[in-house]
Amino acid sequence: MAKLSTDELLDAFKEMTLLELSEFVKQFEDTFGVTAAAPVAIAAGPVAGGAGGEAAAVEEQDEFDVILESVGDKKIQVIKEVRALTSLGLKEAKDLVDGAPKPVLEKVAKEAADKAKAALEGAGATVTVK
């Protein structure tokens, strides 16, 4: 297979739809074991006492799904937040919101999941993190 230059790759990406690019990113992440999520810096708070020994024994989950359960009465604000979190187009974001319950983000870090949950709940949605 001929090696493509960076410019050729960028030209190919410019011709793809957002859905095609989203699928490409997912396959790229799976193939190379990386994530395209932007790192989020959050200061760690003090750990609550009493469960220190047990918490160390249980393996901590490191990937979370953000599930949009219901929209509430501020549908437009929720669509705007979904677009900001996922880089989806207007139609795709509206379809996702209309089809609730649906996952908004999958396999993201705890900090990113908590940030997304707070943003969506601030817009009036009901959200769970699994």
UniProtKB/Swiss-Prot annotation:
Entry-linked Pfam families: Ribosomal_L12, Ribosomal_L12_N
Keywords (alphabetical) are: Ribonucleoprotein, Ribosomal protein
- Top-level division of the source organism's lineage: Bacteria
Q: Does the keyword Repeat apply?
A: no
- PANTHER family per the UniProt record, alphabetical: 39S RIBOSOMAL PROTEIN L12 (PTHR45987), LARGE RIBOSOMAL SUBUNIT PROTEIN BL12M (PTHR45987:SF4)
Which NCBIfam families does the record match to this protein? L12
- What family classification does the UniProt entry report for this protein? Belongs to the bacterial ribosomal protein bL12 family.
Function comment: Forms part of the ribosomal stalk which helps the ribosome interact with GTP-bound translation factors. Is thus essential for accurate translation.
Subunit organization = Homodimer. Part of the ribosomal stalk of the 50S ribosomal subunit. Forms a multimeric L10(L12)X complex, where L10 forms an elongated spine to which 2 to 4 L12 dimers bind in a sequential fashion. Binds GTP-bound translation factors.
This chain's protein is named Large ribosomal subunit protein bL12
Which lineage is the organism of this entry classified under, starting from the top rank? Bacteria, Bacillati, Actinomycetota, Actinomycetes, Frankiales
